[in-house]
UniProtKB/Swiss-Prot annotation:
One of its GO terms (molecular function) is ATP binding. This is Nucleoside diphosphate kinase. The gene is ndk. NCBIfam families: PRK00668.1 (NF001908). SMART domains: NDK (SM00562). Keywords: ATP-binding, Cytoplasm, Kinase, Magnesium, Metal-binding, Nucleotide metabolism, Nucleotide-binding, Phosphoprotein, Transferase. It is an enzyme of class 2 (transferase). It comes from Thermosipho melanesiensis (strain DSM 12029 / CIP 104789 / BI429). One of its GO terms (cellular component) is cytoplasm. Coiled coil: none annotated. The keyword Glycosyltransferase does not apply. Major role in the synthesis of nucleoside triphosphates other than ATP. The ATP gamma phosphate is transferred to the NDP beta phosphate via a ping-pong mechanism, using a phosphorylated active-site intermediate. Homotetramer. ATP binds at residues 9, 57, 85, 91, 102, 112. The active site is at 115 (pros-phosphohistidine intermediate).
Length: 147
């Protein structure tokens, strides 16, 4: 099984889309193994987006993601990195496909509702900013035999 890190940005929380987004993952057989609601600190945001430091959108992004509560999770399934990125759609909502989270609900590139790790390496780096190993719960999901 593969794992990935996902977090719902403040506008997803404020717009009441948390349940809808989680539902889309669960309906695909994706197992949530860690989940929390919290305010992201500036330090966490800067660590998460360190590769964008110096870019013209960096400060706006940091202010946005620290400006309200977020929901972070670690999810698990076969090929979950690829699957989650397919479900959420392109970073640019105008390029995101119909039926994707961003295609249906997002308005701008910066405020695109959701972030997901794009590789195993980034998952390993990103989830550790928000979760300790003992916060990840292993359990049997009934649909596991079907995936």
């Amino acid at each position: 099984m593969e794992r990935t890190f996902v977090y719902l940005k403040p506008n997803a929380v404020r717009r009441g889309l948390v349940g809808e987004i989680i539902k889309r993952f669960e309906q695909r057989g994706i197992k949530i193994v860690a989940l929390k609601l919290f305010w992201m600190t500036r330090e966490q945001a800067e660590r998460l987006y360190e590769m964008h430091k110096g870019k013209n959108f960096y400060n706006e992004l940091i202010e946005f993601v620290t400006g309200g509560p977020v929901v972070a999770m670690v999810v698990e399934a076969p090929r979950v990195i690829e699957m989650v990125r397919h479900i959420i759609g392109n970073t640019d909502p105008l390029k995101a496909g119909t039926g994707t989270i961003r295609g249906e609900f997002a308005l701008t590139v910066t405020k695109n509702l959701i972030h997901a790790s794009d590789s195993k390496e980034n998952f390993e780096r990103e989830y550790k900013i928000f979760f300790s190993e003992n916060e990840i719960v292993d359990y049997y999901l009934d649909v596991q035999d079907d995936i």
